[in-house]
């Protein structure tokens, strides 16, 4: 596959959705999952600050292992008002989250940080996509929770999977909801010289 890399890129995430999005964008990269304790980050802080801090922490933790590469850390959360919804731990929590999201609008925040140890350059961007669910019946909520899809996803749903039927409207970046705002990421990587669309002669 044709790639757009000029320099080595590391993805500090084990998310299969981020892996797929970056591959589709033509980025050649390696994966090194960040080993951090997310519970130490205060969930009471504003959603944008919370997700930016996590993306930066992940990027810096992995970047230390790759002095000559650009490292990308990312994190996605769902917020309803001032309440941050993480990944449901089980069926009951998934049902609770889906009930909260039913027939209302919520925000999906994804932040990414790009850094490298041998450079002073560090970019953090956060993108907010507004998503509205249709009114969900109890049967729909329980059926979807039983599919198992909600359990590794912020907010308890996957817009790119079975959970697409939950979504009535979306305003903003679709890939941001999946897990990585590709348009903004490409622009940031290009501004750092990590990628280029010019043909290499």
Segments and roles (model prediction):
Residues 3-10, 44-201:
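Anionic-ligand binding patches
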Residues 4-27:
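N-terminal beta1-alpha1 ligand-phosphate binding loop
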Residues 14, 34, 117:
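Cofactor-binding loop segments of dinucleotide-utilizing enzymes, especially the Rossmann-like FAD-
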Residues 23, 41, 142:
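A short local structural element in Rossmann-fold oxidoreductases
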Residues 29-30, 197:
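A local structural micro-motif
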Residues 30-38:
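A short beta-strand-loop structural module common to alpha/beta enzyme folds
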Residues 38-39, 48:
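Catalytic cores of phosphodiester-bond-cleaving enzymes
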